């Protein structure tokens, strides 16, 4: 027999990386928010790699921070190492990556949530949704507690019908041997949602005391203090190194000899795995010409001896894993503390979502994270903050927010999911973004902080500091556009010392900065500012001036896109009434129900000819609609 347990504006189901961002975003907007999670000891748990950031993903973390989210602040307080990647490349692909103390990361995030006004945390498993007239009204837990809400966000990770597979052993489980969620998955199917079966995996963990580090290569963090959050002022300087080693031909031989025992190749695993994070057995089979593969040894925290063996994700039997490890330089006598495993789980087909992450089928129900078919903590957190923002705004009677592909990598991620769908765990890559020169690590605040402030997630104090930074950037750019550097003997000597060609005439400081050998620091040696500027202001000035032409070209492309985005497609349009559109295109348009012509043009199977016919039809104004 059920009972009424409470009323809230928003309920978030799950407290992983999507759930914590969703809950905090909702509560910080003023919505009374409840988080229900299977185990309160596992808030923001990292079941796989103990790291945050990397190419594209690191930019997402910055975007979450610019909007007012928590992931960046939390990793800045709890990392053991920080590195800027791709420093030898252009600003569009630079990205920050941090090794996390995974246990401290959990502890700090749970503390943040416990201290958040408007946020209640409860341990409990949700079995059903309360749905009436295609509207989600709340949830029911396995104990029969009925919690009512105006919006519900599902962030269930890999728990939906989770199944762990290790060799020929298979059992129902969430990650790290936690309870799986069985009934909720069946309930979603009963409600009419299309589900898919995906798979991911994790490598073994080994005892640091048993590693011979003299046979590995040290991978230290950066000497320059770095941070993900724009608010961080205190930097961790006591960093721990990671270590690099490689598989050997003997490792590959053991894998080849035991492929018949691999669940991936025996048919035990039915779910589709991540393309960009293959298992070691997959790598050995697919790249059999490679004599070795990189293995990174990553400490899981400051107060544990467990080391994550990155690059060795596997579901081979335990005895094979131990033999495999002993063939890797430095790991000959290693003690395996936890075996690697694969986990299968249910996810929903994400084309069943609007760009707000609300489901099309049931109003007031939102989904975020791995339930939407993505992989990665950062992708989950990016969806989480947007689902939390929109669930909170819907509950409070406010207009929902959609990030476009030109606004943020989060916008690219969500648009890809809801427009194209995915047939494998989706990973965000820089190559997925058309406007990556605009979506940089360094300018996330310039792109999104104003929006975060208007939503209510950025404080007045932080917003004022942001405005001062913007003004300082514009003032310094204006100065450099007007200052003329004359070809004095001293100037010519300095330019020659940098490998540049001498000036023929006076030149604007901004034009001099565009030379490949020049940067902001070298230009201000010749044209000093009245007072030294903060490093983040200097960085912005340099990038905006140096890449001015390319940035301008990208902005022109964005303007064209916006014109297409502004051509809205009416709700309930009857595509069958439009003559000339190909049958496949009609099927896809009816399935996705795009909100704009631009979104329609990105659907797989919809061709330019179909878009031209759609545009003509919309301009005629006589639009047939299907009955509600």
Swiss-Prot record:
InterPro entries: FAD/NAD-bd_sf, GIDA_C_N, MnmG, MnmG-rel, MnmG-rel_CS, MnmG_C, MnmG_C_subdom, MnmG_C_subdom_sf
Function in brief: NAD-binding protein involved in the addition of a carboxymethylaminomethyl (cmnm) group at the wobble position (U34) of certain tRNAs, forming tRNA-cmnm(5)s(2)U34.
Keywords per UniProt: Cytoplasm, FAD, Flavoprotein, NAD, tRNA processing
NCBIfam families: mnmG_gidA (TIGR00136)
Quaternary state and interactors: Homodimer. Heterotetramer of two MnmE and two MnmG subunits.
Cellular component, GO, one term: cytosol
Full protein name: tRNA uridine 5-carboxymethylaminomethyl modification enzyme MnmG
Gene responsible for this protein: mnmG
Family to which the UniProt record says this protein belongs: Belongs to the MnmG family.
Positions bound to FAD: 14-19, 126, 181, 370
Molecular functions (GO terms): flavin adenine dinucleotide binding
Positions with a binding annotation for NAD(+): 273-287
An individual GO BP term: tRNA wobble uridine modification
Pfam families: GIDA, GIDA_C_1st, SAM_GIDA_C
Keyword Flavoprotein: yes
PROSITE patterns membership: GIDA_1, GIDA_2
Lineage, top ranks: Bacteria, Bacillati, Bacillota, Bacilli, Bacillales
């Amino acid at each position: 027999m059920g009972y009424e347990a409470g009323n809230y504006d928003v309920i978030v189901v799950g407290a992983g990386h999507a759930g914590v961002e969703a809950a905090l975003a909702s509560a910080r907007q003023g919505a009374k928010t409840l988080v229900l999670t299977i185990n309160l000891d596992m808030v923001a748990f990292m079941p796989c790699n103990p790291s945050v950031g990397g190419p594209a993903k690191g930019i997402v973390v910055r975007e979450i921070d610019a909007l007012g989210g928590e992931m960046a602040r939390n990793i800045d307080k709890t990392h053991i190492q920080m590195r800027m990647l791709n420093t030898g490349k252009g600003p569009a692909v630079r990205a920050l990556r941090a090794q996390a103390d995974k246990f401290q990361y959990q502890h700090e995030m749970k503390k943040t949530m416990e201290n958040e006004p408007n946020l209640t945390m409860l341990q409990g498993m949700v079995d059903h949704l309360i749905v009436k007239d295609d509207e989600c009204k709340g949830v029911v837990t396995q104990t029969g507690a009925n919690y009512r809400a105006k919006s519900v966000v599902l962030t269930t990770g890999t728990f939906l019908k989770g199944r762990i597979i290790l060799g020929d052993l298979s059992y129902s489980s969430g990650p790290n041997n936690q309870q799986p969620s069985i009934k909720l998955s069946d309930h979603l199917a009963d409600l009419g949602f299309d589900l898919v079966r995906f798979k991911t995996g994790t490598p073994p963990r080994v005892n640091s005391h048993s590693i011979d580090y003299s046979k590995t290569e040290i991978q230290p963090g950066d000497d320059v203090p770095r941070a993900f959050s724009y608010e961080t002022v205190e930097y961790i300087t006591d960093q721990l190194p990671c270590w690099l080693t490689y598989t050997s031909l003997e490792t590959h031989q053991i894998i080849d000899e035991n492929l018949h025992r691999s669940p991936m190749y025996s048919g035990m695993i039915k779910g589709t795995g991540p393309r960009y994070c293959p298992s070691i057995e997959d790598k050995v089979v697919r790249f059999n010409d490679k004599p070795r593969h990189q293995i990174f040894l990553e400490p899981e925290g400051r107060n544990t001896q467990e080391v994550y063996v990155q690059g060795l994700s596997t579901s081979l039997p335990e005895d094979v894993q131990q033999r495999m490890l002993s063939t890797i330089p430095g790991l000959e006598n290693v003690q395996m503390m936890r075996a690697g495993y694969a986990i299968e789980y249910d996810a929903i087909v994400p084309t069943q979502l609007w760009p707000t992450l609300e489901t099309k089928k049931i109003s007031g129900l939102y989904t975020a994270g791995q339930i939407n078919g993505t992989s990665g903590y950062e992708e989950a957190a990016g969806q989480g903050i947007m689902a939390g923002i929109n669930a909170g705004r819907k509950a409070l009677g406010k207009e929902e927010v959609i990030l476009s592909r030109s606004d943020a990598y989060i916008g690219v991620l969500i648009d890809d999911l809801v427009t194209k769908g995915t047939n494998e765990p989706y990973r965000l890559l820089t190559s997925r973004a058309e406007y990556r020169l605009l979506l940089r690590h360094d300018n996330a605040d310039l792109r999104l902080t104003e929006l975060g402030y208007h939503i209510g997630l950025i404080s007045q104090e932080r917003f004022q500091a942001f405005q001062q930074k913007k003004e300082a950037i514009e003032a310094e750019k204006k100065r450099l556009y007007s200052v003329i550097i004359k070809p004095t003997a001293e100037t010519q000597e300095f330019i020659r010392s940098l490998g540049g060609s001498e000036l023929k005439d006076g030149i604007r400081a901004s034009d001099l900065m565009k030379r490949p050998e020049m940067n902001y620091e070298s230009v201000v040696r010749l044209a000093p500012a009245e007072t030294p500027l903060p490093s983040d202001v200097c960085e912005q000035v340099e990038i905006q001036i140096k890449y001015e032409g390319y940035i301008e070209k990208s902005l022109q492309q964005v303007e064209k896109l916006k014109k297409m985005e502004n051509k809205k497609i009416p709700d309930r349009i009857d595509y069958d009434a439009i003559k000339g559109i190909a049958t496949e295109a009609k099927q896809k348009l009816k399935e996705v129900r795009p909100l704009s012509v631009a979104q329609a043009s990105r659907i797989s199977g919809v061709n330019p000819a179909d878009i031209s016919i759609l545009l003509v039809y919309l301009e005629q104004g006589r639009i047939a609609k299907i009955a509600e």
